[in-house]
Amino acid sequence: MSPMSDQDFYTFREYLRKEHEYLSPSAEDYVEMIYRLSREHGFTRVNDLATALNVQPPSVTKMIQKLSEMKLLKYEKYGFIILEAPGLEKGEALLKRHNIVESFLKLLNVKEGLLEETEKIEHMINNEILCGIHDLVDYFDNNPRLLKTFNEYRTTRE
């Protein structure tokens, strides 16, 4: 059997694993939320995180242990959850990614399911695509007349 091209094909999961510093989408959600909750006081707690993510505290504890093993955070049983430097960096990047995707969807006038769609998309795009989306959002933010023209164009196509 001859190869289809010079590139190797992988399953979707393997493409994700090949990404630098791979975290599962669920782990990314935890790191992002810990970052959000920790911004004011520098820490959060299991129950606060469970409430914010709509999960049970034992699920939080299990994930926190994994993230602690990855050196992204410090956690002592029944204590504070504190992001380490790599966790802070990752959390900041994840929140930025979330905000960029959300801004893009708002630019497209997505209203129904905005948070859900943002969450789905943010885990599936790479940095090159994210940078392109960020540039596009920034371009339209700085050129409101063109955004108006774009929205008029979209309206005429419906």
Task: List the model feature ranges, each with a label.
Residues 1-22:
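N-terminal leader segment of winged-helix/HTH proteins
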Residues 46-78, 85:
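Canonical helix-turn-helix DNA-binding module
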Residues 79-98:
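Basic, amphipathic "hinge/linker" alpha-helix immediately C-terminal to the N-terminal HTH DNA-binding motif
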Residues 3, 122-158:
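C-terminal regulatory/oligomerization modules of transcriptional regulators
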Residues 93-132, 136-139:
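Arg/Lys-rich, alpha-helical DNA-contact motif
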Residues 34-38, 67, 105:
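Hydrophobic structural patches
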Residues 24, 83-84, 126:
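Residue-level signal for threonine
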Residues 17-55:
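N-terminal helix-turn-helix DNA-binding core of bacterial DNA-binding proteins
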